[in-house]
Amino acid sequence: MPARILTIAQQKGGAGKTTLAAQLAVTWAKAGRRVGLLDIDPQGSLSAWFALRHARLGDEANLTLVQAAGWRLGTELDRLRAGHDLVLIDSPPHAETEVRIAVRAATLILVPIQPSPMDLWATAPTLEIARREKIPALALLNRAPAKGKLVDRIRADLAASGVTLTTTSLGNRIAFASAMLDGRGVSETQPRGSAASELTRLATELEQSLAY
């Protein structure tokens, strides 16, 4: 069965796409899924994280990464799709051609949003591409405080715009950055911590959405 493809996209830089891709990939790989990562962001942060991980852990049966752009993108995506259960695409913030290809290939699009007006406003172009391509999309509140008026306002504004939010949100936790610095996931560095618990719930929720 071809892989289900999760494209992580957001027009605004610094929304946490790369961290999200890496952390979800580790969580799913540890659960026995064959996970492929496709890094199409010219910045190459996901590839740098993976190189650090590979240097420390060596080859892993359930986790691979390919970096591609331009004409190679479709070919590499087909290869990953054929050999994995799940493929995660880390997309660039502003390269419209690559983003469109990643969106069209997706089973589901995940749009991370930090609780700020700028992130909220930046979601519109990505969601519009998803609507035009008729690909389901979910928004995720990322680096969010546990509660507060701003978070409530952003939730309300997203709902009023017809945007579907994931039930799970991710807190603003240093554990994510610490794990990335080690080339690992929070499910490995702090498996009983709050960050790992949030990631596990999010991974379960997304996998259910990807199944349809």
Region roles according to the model:
Residues 120-136, 142:
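Conserved C-terminal guanine-recognition region of P-loop GTPase G domains, centered on the G4
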